Amino acid sequence: MKLSPTVILAFCWLATVTVATAEFEDRSFLWRASSGERSVYLLGSIHFMKADSYPLSPVVENAFEIAETVVFEADLDQLNRAAVLMLAEGTLEGDAILADVVSEELYREVSKRLEAAGMSISNFTKMKPWMLALSLTSFELMRAGYLGGEGVDAHFDARAKNEGKRRDALESVEFQVSLFADLSDEESEEFLRYTLVELDAVIPVVDEIVATWKAGDPTRMEAVSYT
């Protein structure tokens, strides 16, 4: 009796999905690499989506249905731990406040931006610049209806859990947090400055990324992602 094919569905960042020998799957960001009876499906994932984004294309849904193991970028069971780590790493130490670690001009710009959104900078003075930058972007996404809980990875993680599929992760939450926590003070400030400049364009760009992802157009995705 032959063993059933081993099928792994992996969720990766759109910008890093590269499979030189993969077979492109029917106008979607799903690739398949096979060797004999073994198949690996690679799906470019968007981490923030709207609730009405599902179901996805039949080819993606079918890949999930036949998958025995589902591998995600990070362990979504560790989200609470990730939040605790982010808070710990993203908080300024001792008596330091945001005004101490960014320029006066940048501090004023951040304050105006928060006030325009109905918030006070006094609630964010202990955040490191990179943490505040992430928070500002998250606020914009949520206001437009994009939610992490509706992301492609979160969607399929919940389904995999409910259906009893094996689940695994490529990265630890510690590694993901370190990508920001390891920024130098100068890099952290520049990240916040860049975020403020680009903040008004976030939703139009995300709208286009999602539309391009649904259309399965990798050429257009590259243009959108690197402009």
Residue locations for each model-derived region?
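Bacterial N-terminal signal peptides
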Residues: 8-16
